[in-house]
A protein has these predicted regions:
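Juxtamembrane/disordered regions of integral membrane proteins
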Residues: 1-142
Length: 142
């Protein structure tokens, strides 16, 4: 079994992050334009807090980069078993999405998150596979 190429893993994660942001702008922007549905609006209404500033945006991007690098690590870990094609990227993104969905469902059940959080999970069901497929095009084993 080949070792995971750490440099390529980080690069693939960063590329996946940019792909995620691009698809998020298209998907969520379209939904907001067509149906006036906004994930950010639901969270702002539920938590009544307005975050902004440079540190907020730097941390938000840093967390997104970390998430995408972790997803690409899942992809790299299952790649020897599933092969290096789009199916593996989709499986990795669905594994990650399922963990996030169960975490969100638990918090909705506890009353911590609003039920509208599932709309964001629906958006992620589109955004994550595309991001991992784009990232998988960059990743190569070392």
């Amino acid at each position: 079994m080949k070792k995971i190429n750490s440099g390529r893993l980080v690069l693939a994660g960063l590329v996946a992050s940019f792909a995620f942001i691009f698809v998020e702008i298209i998907v969520e922007g379209s939904m907001h334009f067509l149906f006036r549905i906004s994930e950010a609006k639901f969270y702002l209404e539920a938590f009544e807090m307005r975050k902004s500033g440079v540190l907020f945006h730097i941390l938000n991007l840093g967390i997104l980069f970390a998430i995408c690098i972790l997803i690409m690590w899942v992809y790299a870990a299952i790649r020897p078993r599933f092969g290096s094609h789009g199916k593996t990227a989709i499986v990795a993104s669905l594994i990650f999405w399922l963990f996030a969905f169960l975490f969100t469902a638990n918090h909705v059940n506890l009353g911590i998150f609003p039920p509208m959080s599932f709309i964001g999970m629906g958006f992620n069901l589109i955004e994550l596979p595309v991001a991992v497929i784009v990232g998988s095009a960059i990743y190569r084993e070392g």
